[in-house]
Amino acid sequence: MKKQKATSQKPKITYRVNEQIRVPEVRIIFPDGTQQVMKTIDARRMAEDRNTDLIEVQPNAEPPVCKFDNLGKLLYKMAQRDKDLKKKQKTTTLKELRFHPNTDKHDFDFKTAHLEEFLRKGNRVRATIVFLGRSIIYKDKGLELADRLTERLSVVGNREGEPKFEGKKLFVYFEPDKKKIDAYERIRSKTGTPLAPLEESADAED
């Protein structure tokens, strides 16, 4: 049995157009916002005179509400809207790097550069501050580190809520901010400062 070729799905029309509209009369909403109730046959003729389609947009109204528009353009707008929605709903990867409350400056700078890079690429990030042994008594140092991370990453992202303790770990989440990232990239391109290389990354699950 031959496999059927996959076909791209076009936006479904959820309303009637032109001759499909068979009610006696309709309410027309004109581009300037004015309205007029008229016989459907007259509305269809007017649509033809305007070189547009008569499109029913509120079938449950009494009488049904219609407008004059180009069906092809309307379908294109619907397709673009669906495309934009899918982009917004696109899932991002959660990246994670670990710190310790006594992380030195070199290690802090190195790891935050990686977190910054992750955010610039549109990923959410999680900084996990691990308290080994009795270091859990120094929770204030962990919170101070979380504040330093927040300040450092504020150029490309925003912190999600407050840092959260779970056992001997402190979790700090950040999400990318497109406006900040765009501004950051413009400054980078003008100054010519090379971006920090990204060597390895770790994926984490929500």
Curated annotation (Swiss-Prot):
GO BP term, example: ribosome disassembly
Domain of life: Bacteria
One annotated GO molecular function: translation initiation factor activity
Pfam families according to UniProt: IF3_C (PF00707), IF3_N (PF05198)
InterPro entries assigned: T_IF-3_C_sf (IPR036788), T_IF-3_N_sf (IPR036787), Translation_initiation_fac_3 (IPR001288), Translation_initiation_fac_3_C (IPR019815), Translation_initiation_fac_3_N (IPR019814)
Subunit relationships: Monomer.
Family: Belongs to the IF-3 family.
Protein name: Translation initiation factor IF-3
Organism ancestry: Bacteria, Pseudomonadati, Chlorobiota, Chlorobiia, Chlorobiales
Gene that produces this protein: infC
